[in-house]
Every structure is written in C-alpha cells, then in structure tokens.
Amino acid sequence: MATIGYFGDSFCAGREPESWCVLLANRLKANIVHWGEPGRSIWSTFFSFERVKHFDRIPDYSVFCWTEPYRLYHKELILSANTERLPHVNPKIYDALDDYWVYLHDYKKDELAYTYSLKHFDNQILSSVKDKTRIVQTWSFRPFETAGRHPNIQLSSGEFIDESMFNFAKSNQGSKSEQAILPDWNNTGLINHMTIEQNQHWADKVYERLSS
C-alpha cells in the first residue's frame, strides 16, 4: 500500500474522518505515516523530514504545510509569542522565552533566516528526493502575512500551491458557514481550523495536483 506523510503544523494534524488529510489519503489509497505537529516551527518540520530520510522511510507522497517564521524551535515544547504556560514545565523556560521576545527578538532576522532556510530545504533537500516521493508544498500561513507583509517566495520541488490555508479558512472559501472561522483557534467544531466543507475542498485541491 502506498504511504503519505504530512509535515507541518496544526493545519495538517487533524485525524478525524472528515480531515482533508484523511480524505486525501483515502483517495490516493495511501496509509498515513506522518502527521503535522500543532504549534511547531518550520525547524520541527525540517527535523521530522530529516529523520524519515535518515531511516529511509520517505513516504510515497510528502505534503508540506509551511507555517509562519515567528516560532522558536524546542524539541518538546511549543514556544511562540503568547505561549500558554503549562504547569508541569519549568517556569524558567517561559521566563527565558518572555525575555527573548522583549530583549533579543528581531523580525527581520526571523524573516531572513526563514527565507534562506526554506529555500535551502526546497532546493537542496527536497530536490534530492523528488524521484522517491511525490511532493506538494503549500502554506499554513503565507510567509509574513501575520506581520502584514507578503514576500514572493516561490518553491520549486514538486507541486507548489501558493495559497495560505489560514487565509482560506478565514475567508470561508468553500464553506457554507456565513461566520468568520478564525481567529477562534479553539473552536472544537473545526478540523485543521476549517469546516468540513473546507476540508473536502482542500483535499480536492491537493488531489488535483497529485493526479495531474
């Protein structure tokens, strides 16, 4: 049986039957071997794919949903601005995070590092495995859109859907609902931050690229 892996954040983490990830896998007759990790940075995505590559477990289909640049990497914790403190975690970690955002953080540095690292991953890593896996790349968040900027980053390995899933969900495209979806991130009625109709629409969109 074919395999498919989703690499990214919470926009490709939903395991419900109505999730676009599950719908797409069913249409491809593929077993899901990797899921997105909610709240994680692009560095978590890089490390996840490097692990499957190292152990020669690259799936037949690899779908990447790239998140925003403003998340810090930690191998166990979600760390970004306004991260909720967990009671079992050493509070010094969150104190250090708060200090980082106040005294050390630089948006331009984040954006430059994001652009360079993502292009390197696209041009050097993914291009080297494109004969082993069908690749689709898209945006969970279009780069820097949460900061009000929209640089033109083009990705060349595999199929590139140059659309923001965040914006797709927020604008209610493909949904019967009349109310805005985001930024109600904790709405339990949503899957991958989208309605059931939107999940179906997104599964169709990705399937069309993979079947073309």
Kindly give the residue locations of the regions a language model identified:
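Serine-esterase "nucleophile elbow" of acetyl-processing enzymes
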Residues: 1-46, 54, 195, 201
